[in-house]
Amino acid sequence: MSAPNPKAFPLADATLTNQILDLIQQASHYKQLKKGANEATKTLNRGICEFIVMAADVEPIEIVLHLPLLCEDKNVPYVFVPSKTALGRACGVSRPVVSASVTTNEARELQSQIQTVKLAIERLLI
């Protein structure tokens, strides 16, 4: 794998990446996950997004760079993970995924884990 794009900031470290990918896998079981840049944009605009995860090895990177701007407008944390293939596997699809959105839900089985990951992502953004 090539070096991650310098525009991909903030980039999660290995432990945070694993934590995020585990949470994404669980969120997909609870139907709290939207896959792809377009669906992530929709969740941001609807206000149901907890946080956004993007892949740093997207080529060209510009296809996801509208999301950090939207996230900052909506005050939603966002983070880059190193691999689109790993993100796709965590989402439960056989294709690479460039971005994913973990959404809010009334059932809230994952709420404590979502809050933990959100805090870790917000610490990266400071």
UniProtKB/Swiss-Prot annotation:
A molecular-function term among this protein's GO annotations: RNA binding
Taxonomic superkingdom: Eukaryota
GO biological process, one term: maturation of SSU-rRNA
InterPro entries the record matches: eL8/uL1-like, H/ACA_rnp_Nhp2-like, Ribosomal_eL30-like_sf, Ribosomal_eL8-like_CS, Ribosomal_eL8/eL30/eS12/Gad45, Ribosomal_eL8/Nhp2
Coiled coil: none
Keyword presence, RNA-binding: yes
Main location per the UniProt record: nucleus
Keyword terms of this UniProt record: mRNA processing, mRNA splicing, Nucleus, Ribonucleoprotein, Ribosome biogenesis, RNA-binding, rRNA processing, Spliceosome
Locations listed in the record: Nucleus, Nucleolus
One CC-aspect GO term: U4/U6 x U5 tri-snRNP complex
SUPFAM superfamilies per record: L30e-like
Function text: Common component of the spliceosome and rRNA processing machinery. In association with the spliceosomal U4/U6.U5 tri-snRNP particle, required for splicing of pre-mRNA. In association with box C/D snoRNPs, required for processing of pre-ribosomal RNA (rRNA) and site-specific 2'-O-methylation of substrate RNAs. Essential for the accumulation and stability of U4 snRNA, U6 snRNA, and box C/D snoRNAs.
Recorded family membership: Belongs to the eukaryotic ribosomal protein eL8 family.
Oligomer status and interactors: Component of the U3 snoRNP particle. Binds to the C'/D and B/C motifs in U3 snoRNA. Component of the 25S U4/U6.U5 tri-snRNP particle, a subcomplex of the spliceosome. Binds to the 5' stem-loop of U4 snRNA.
Protein's name in the database: 13 kDa ribonucleoprotein-associated protein
Protein's organism: Mycosarcoma maydis
